[in-house]
UniProtKB/Swiss-Prot annotation:
Record-annotated membrane-spanning stretches: none
Organism per entry: Dictyostelium discoideum (Social amoeba)
UniProt keyword terms in alphabetical order: Secreted, Signal
Claim: Zinc is one of the keywords in the record: no
Protein name: Uncharacterized protein DDB_G0274485
Biased composition (Basic and acidic residues): 86-101
Highest taxon of source: Eukaryota
Region forming the signal peptide: 1-18
Subcellular location: Secreted
């Protein structure tokens, strides 16, 4: 019975020593919070309106297609992965590099944040229009810190930027421009 326990113990020790310490295993990264937000761009030019040639009224039903109005905006987003404790997985501490003070206790071995951007535009004229949206996606190198042997391996993670929104002026009596007398209504 004692021999079996010794054999099992030897097997477990051998297994723990066989763990690769220089591999950049994506499973060692935990997903942090994802932040995405969009901005609104500047408003474009005002549309124009047509008026009745009989009484000069500004009838919304007689709005004509004025200049196209457009705007663009950008947003940002990113995430902050946290490296798990490699010491629990048989990793050896890399003593060849200076250790970050926050990592002395082998907790949260590396923290990284990234940000992306996106843009969009919207255009419209007359009484109705539309708002455009867009999003950006890019990659950035993520290093697991300088605490363990795998610190010289960079992982490329993707993050998504927030959507940008464009807007335009809708034709109202307050913001439209008089584009002249319209006949043939």
């Amino acid at each position: 019975m004692l021999l079996k326990l010794i054999l099992i113990l030897c097997f477990l020790v051998t297994l723990s020593l066989s763990v690769k310490v220089d591999s950049a295993d994506p499973a060692l990264f935990t997903q942090g919070p994802t932040i995405a937000s969009g901005g609104t761009g500047n408003t474009g030019a005002n549309p124009c309106y047509g008026h009745d040639d009989e009484d000069g009224s500004k009838d919304p039903a007689m709005f004509t297609q004025g200049p196209v109005s457009s705007g663009s905006g950008s947003g940002s987003g990113g995430y902050c992965p946290h490296h798990k404790n490699r010491a629990q997985e048989g990793g050896k501490k890399d003593t060849t590099k200076e250790q970050p003070k926050e990592n002395n206790n082998n907790k949260n071995l590396g923290r990284h944040s990234s940000s992306g951007s996106g843009s969009g535009s919207g255009s419209g004229c007359g009484v109705t229009g539309d708002t455009g949206t867009g999003s950006g996606r890019t990659t950035a190198p993520v290093n697991d810190g300088v605490t363990y042997k795998s610190s010289n391996v960079k992982e490329t993670e993707q993050y998504r930027g927030g959507a940008g929104r464009g807007k335009h002026n809708q034709a109202t009596e307050e913001n439209v421009q008089d584009c002249g007398e319209i006949t043939g209504w």
